[in-house]
């Protein structure tokens, strides 16, 4: 039985993984409450609201009941809570595929090496690009199979910045990188055309869950 302090949980739900190299898989999600970064195109602002205190054992009971092929810990910003590291390790002990989605502002060096980390890189339109944690790039270059980076693009200016940024940090062509359009702001066709024009070796994604369900729905 876990003796760690409870974590503050926004929601636990079962849905389709929508925005990573694991997109399309049924997935159990644990969304932790709290963030505070203020990204302009955040689509989970409700995760800033007070959550429910749950122990790791309680979380595990809920998650394992879904019998999902993968589990994702997300937020908010999950790494703001110190108990997240213990939760990730506990999930890895019981589940073969554990994902972490983080905003990319905090180092991931304390994350259990069995976890596959999906790390955001914030572009200029986010309003918070100065908080990107460059230390994560060094870690990913040493163990590229454990990490992928995701950049949400709102304009061609964002796209050109992102292309230069990932090349400048040495991760282009060496780490898995995903570009996606800001839902409702950038036409996906434009992003696809820019990538094809530039022969850019990155993956394009759409937020799959927003095309399946109401884009503003929670728990999907």
Swiss-Prot record:
InterPro entries: 7-CO-7-deazaguanine_synth-like (IPR024924), Aldolase_TIM (IPR013785), rSAM (IPR007197). Mg(2+) binds at residue 44. One of its GO terms (molecular function) is S-adenosyl-L-methionine binding. GO terms for biological process: queuosine biosynthetic process. [4Fe-4S] cluster binds at residues 35, 39, 42. Pathway: Purine metabolism; 7-cyano-7-deazaguanine biosynthesis. Its cofactor is [4Fe-4S] cluster; S-adenosyl-L-methionine; Mg(2+). It holds the Pfam family Radical_SAM. It is an enzyme of class 4 (lyase). S-adenosyl-L-methionine binds at residue 76. Residues 22-215 form the Radical SAM core domain. Catalyzes the complex heterocyclic radical-mediated conversion of 6-carboxy-5,6,7,8-tetrahydropterin (CPH4) to 7-carboxy-7-deazaguanine (CDG), a step common to the biosynthetic pathways of all 7-deazapurine-containing compounds. Homodimer. HAMAP family: QueE. This is 7-carboxy-7-deazaguanine synthase. The lineage of its organism: Bacteria, Pseudomonadati, Chlorobiota, Chlorobiia, Chlorobiales. The gene is queE.
């Amino acid at each position: 039985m876990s003796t760690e302090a409870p974590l503050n949980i926004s929601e636990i739900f079962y849905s389709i993984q929508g925005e990573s190299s694991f997109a399309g898989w049924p997935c159990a999600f644990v969304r932790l409450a709290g963030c505070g970064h203020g990204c302009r195109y955040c689509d989970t602002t409700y995760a800033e609201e007070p959550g429910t205190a749950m122990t790791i054992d309680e979380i595990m009971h809920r998650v394992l009941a879904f019998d999902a092929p993968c589990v994702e810990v997300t937020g908010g910003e999950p790494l703001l809570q110190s108990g997240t590291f213990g939760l990730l390790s506990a999930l890895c002990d019981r589940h073969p595929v554990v994902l972490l989605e983080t905003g990319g502002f905090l180092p991931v060096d304390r994350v259990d090496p069995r976890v596959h980390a999906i790390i955001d890189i914030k572009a200029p339109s986010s309003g918070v690009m100065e908080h990107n944690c460059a230390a994560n790039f060094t870690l990913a270059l040493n163990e590229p199979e454990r990490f992928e980076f995701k950049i949400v693009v709102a304009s061609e200016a964002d796209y050109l910045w992102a292309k230069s940024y990932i090349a400048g940090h040495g991760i282009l062509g060496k780490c898995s990188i995903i570009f996606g359009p800001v839902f409702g702001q950038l036409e996906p066709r434009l992003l696809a055309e820019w990538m094809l024009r530039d022969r850019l070796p990155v993956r394009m994604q759409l937020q799959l869950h927003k095309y399946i369900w109401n884009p503003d729905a929670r728990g999907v």
